[in-house]
C-alpha cells in the first residue's frame, strides 16, 4: 500500500468514509498513511453520508478538484453510488470488506483486485 500511495502522492487524495473521524484517523495513523491524505472526512463531516454525493463533493471542493479530474475508489456500493452521483469515474475494489458480487452489482467504471492496479488507471 505504501508504495502505491507514494506513486499517487503528487495527486490530491482524500479519504471519505461513513466511519466517525476519530477512529478513521487512528486507522490511518496506525497504517502510517495519514501523510498521503490532506483531506479526511468522517461520517459526521457533512449533513448527508454516502451514498449521498455530499461528502464526495465536499472533498473535491477542499482539494480544488473538478469531477472530470477525479475518481472515487471504494469497496462498497455506497462509495460507487456517491462517486457516480458526484460525476466522478468510479473504481470498485474487490479486496475490501464488501463481497465482490456486491461491488460488481454497483457497476463501477473499473474493478480492481489489488491496490497496485490503480496505478494503471491513473497513469
Regions inferred by a protein language model and the residue ranges of each:
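Surface-exposed amphipathic alpha-helices with a cationic face
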Residues: 2-9, 60, 80-85
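Conserved Lys-Pro-Asp/Glu-containing loop-to-beta segment of HAD-superfamily phosphomonoesterases
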Residues: 50-80
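Conserved H-loop
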Residues: 34-38, 66, 112
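A short, structured active-site edge motif that brings together acidic residues
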Residues: 33-48
Amino acid at each position: 500500500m505504501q508504495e502505491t500511495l507514494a506513486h499517487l502522492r503528487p495527486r490530491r487524495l482524500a479519504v471519505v468514509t461513513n466511519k466517525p473521524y476519530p477512529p478513521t484517523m487512528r486507522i490511518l495513523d496506525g497504517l502510517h498513511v495519514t501523510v498521503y491524505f490532506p483531506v479526511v472526512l468522517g461520517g459526521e463531516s457533512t449533513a448527508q453520508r454516502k451514498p449521498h454525493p455530499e461528502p464526495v463533493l465536499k472533498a473535491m471542493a477542499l482539494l480544488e478538484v473538478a469531477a472530470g479530474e477525479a475518481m472515487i475508489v471504494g469497496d462498497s456500493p455506497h462509495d460507487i453510488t456517491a462517486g457516480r452521483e458526484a460525476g466522478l469515474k468510479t473504481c470498485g475494489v474487490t479486496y475490501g470488506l464488501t463481497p465482490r458480487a456486491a461491488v460488481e452489482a454497483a457497476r463501477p467504471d473499473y474493478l480492481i483486485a489489488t491496490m497496485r492496479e490503480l496505478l494503471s488507471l491513473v497513469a
